[in-house]
Amino acid sequence: MNLSKRWLHDYVNLDVSDQQFADDMTLSGSKVESFETEGADIKNVIVGKVVSLVKHPDSDHLWICQIDVGAKDNIQIVTGAQNLKVNDVVPVAMDDSFVSGGHHIKKGKLRGVESNGMLCSLGELGLTIHDFPYAIEDGIFVLGDDCDKTLGKDIHEAIGLDDVITEFEITSNRADCLSITGLAREAAATFDSKLVIPEPAGKKTHGDVNDFLSVEIKEPSLCYRYAGAVVENVRVKPSPRWMRERLRACGVRPINNIVDITNFVMLEYGQPMHAFDLRYLDGHKVIVRKALDGEKITTLDGVERALKPEMLVIADENKPVAVAGVMGGEYSGIMDDTTTIVFESAMFNGVSVRRTAKALGMRTEASARYEKELDATGCLRSLKRALQLVEELDAGDIVGGVVDCDHSDKTPVTLPFEPEWVNNFIGIDVSAEEQKKILEKIDFKVENGVITAPSFRNDIEHQADISEEIARFYGYDKIPDRALSGVADGRYTDRQKLEKLVTDVMLSEGLSEVCTYTFISPKQYDKLRLPADSPRRDSVKIMNPLGEDTSIMRTTAVPSMLDVLSRNYNNRNPKAAMFEIAVSFKPRGTEELPEEPKNIVIGLYGEEYDYFTLKGVIEELLCKTGITDYDIERVTDDPILHPGRAARITVGGKTLALLGEVHPETAKNFSIGTRCYVAEVSMDVLFENAGAEKVYTPLPKFPAVTRDLAFVCDKSVPVVSLEKEIQSAVGKTLENITLFDVYEGNQIESGKKSVAFSLKLRSKDKTLTDDDADSAMKKAIKAIEKLGATLRS
């Protein structure tokens, strides 16, 4: 937001340097990016008058001019301009001067004739014909009656090119500061000066606006207020110099008096406005509605745009005439032959305007303001200000009254006045009276222990916001430095300790940690082959997604891990072993935030990895977390996993982990052309069952005995069942049991499989004999016979 110093002084009188103004405004919360004086690169250019014009003897297009610059002697300048005549008052760049763009002007000779400077065009002063409409674009700028023609006067002062422009960075929560009056209010409070913003009022009116215009709002949830006024006998002409100067200083190009009035009011009050040519408004009716399917509009920039049904438009009885809050239609613009206009001052839903502007690729000054949710109470005041300017500029005849359709919520924001809370929160000691005074300087009301925020401060929501206002104008530099009191007790929580342990175990097992987005596409569930009614498809939907690929929150991190494996596989990495402690999201209804469980997701592929590698990683994790009592069962009905190479680990009836080889179809859907393996381990179940303490086990004093056993059993018998029977039968003497072979094929009966275990036996009290080991083996063989298994011969 550019602020004109000259315009600012219309509302608040400040006697401070430009640097101090920038520093103090920044300190009070209105950040100044930069400030500069208009035409600062133009130096030693003054006002002069053409005394005589003589043809150059050696040129058919050059003129020798004698110029009076208010000095004792005239100066001679040679020019090629063809628009000059005697007595014209012009800008004169003297010897050793600089014009716009940093061009250095020195005296010299043109075809043998001395020239002691240069006569300037608008472009050489950094201006255009929009700044001085009566000037000639490609000729010397001849000063008009709206300029100071005192000879020898600095050109900056003569043509009003001496304003100081301050650029502010306005944050999204302070839409009120996207206006001159808003920044004037901040400046008045910062420098403790009087703020004067006159209430706009017009005097001359005729007729009744209802005879010219009617308004209907069909979408009150998207258009909170719409006010309109009519001006007849419009006299389209250039705006006066003072208005053009202010618009130029704020970065807006002057066009004509009617358009300039709408831009002037937008800059002054922060309320976007638009002027419609009434003759192109069919039925003389304004209808605020959503666009119809397939509807199009050609906007003021001459581009035809296809509208979508969710976009809000301003329409007449037959067609859209403007994209609400963004830009007017081609035929809504003001032309030289316009006679009757409608001024629009409205309040639209910020989210709707932002989405429309983004979809159409046309972010404008108006949409940039509407996006930030403006003050609906400002609509009428802005409309009255526009009518006042019409009267002041003699731009037309105002029709009496305004049409005002108001659906806005006028409930003010109120908060308790708690000075002590503010002091404790900020760390200052400011009296209640002083706090009240600060708030009243920025138009807050404090009565009976209640603070009422002004309608233009829609960013005020909490007591902390009030504290910020107090701190801003009390002075951040006055808040004393104070060391933090108390002792910071920095410790890991039990869950954080577990996560750290999990990470350490995974890294020690050779896995690399990854971090993936929690946003995914619904199509990922199709790639996982999840049924349409699967609970894992019940996702939290994003209201404003970056795109379809990031439109929902994942309920499982498996697709994210498979994407990582796919990326590595297709980059020709021969193997990958990854893990992530990943967050998933499970909806809990529209009134509650979603549940956010964490799971350990593991992904493997490569020749050296198989199902048992994955199982071994999880078993190591369970060992390190002290979980020894768990069950493993085969899984055949999970669409993600291979039906013959998947398992579920449960603890106390709760699923701790799901692991296995990825189903070939699922792997294909993720463009993985090799066997890959995934596991998902519940951090919640792991935390609930992790051992609280580690039990010390002394180093063994006696040697171990190792025996191998191979059994033949039905293919349907789970290996874990065999392991448990052996462990139960052998007892404490069994130190460890390891599965080292599963075989099906030749020499094994159909429907059967061979399972081989290695048993490690050790006693705490003695060295085991062969008889001891044989006795343990007999117990193991007898135990598995309960499951229909027999010792393989």
Predicted regions and their residues:
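Phosphate-backbone binding interfaces of nucleic-acid-interacting proteins
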Residues: 1-207, 342, 361, 365, ...
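A carboxyl-terminal module marker
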Residues: 2, 19, 27, 441-443, ...
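Glycine/proline-enriched, intrinsically flexible loops and inter-domain linkers
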Residues: 4-5, 23, 63, 196-295, ...
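Beta-rich nucleic-acid/ligand-interaction surfaces
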Residues: 40-43, 203-205, 487-493, 516-535, ...
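Conserved mixed alpha/beta core segments that line enzyme active sites in large multi-domain catalysts
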Residues: 47-76, 245, 256, 262-331
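Mobile "lid/hinge" segments at catalytic clefts and subdomain interfaces of large enzymes
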Residues: 114-131, 135-141, 164, 314-410, ...
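Extended, well-folded interaction surfaces typified by the phenylalanyl-tRNA synthetase beta subunit core
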Residues: 182, 415-574, 707, 760-762, ...
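Terminal amphipathic helices with adjacent charged low-complexity linkers/tails
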Residues: 187, 191-217, 394-422, 428-429, ...
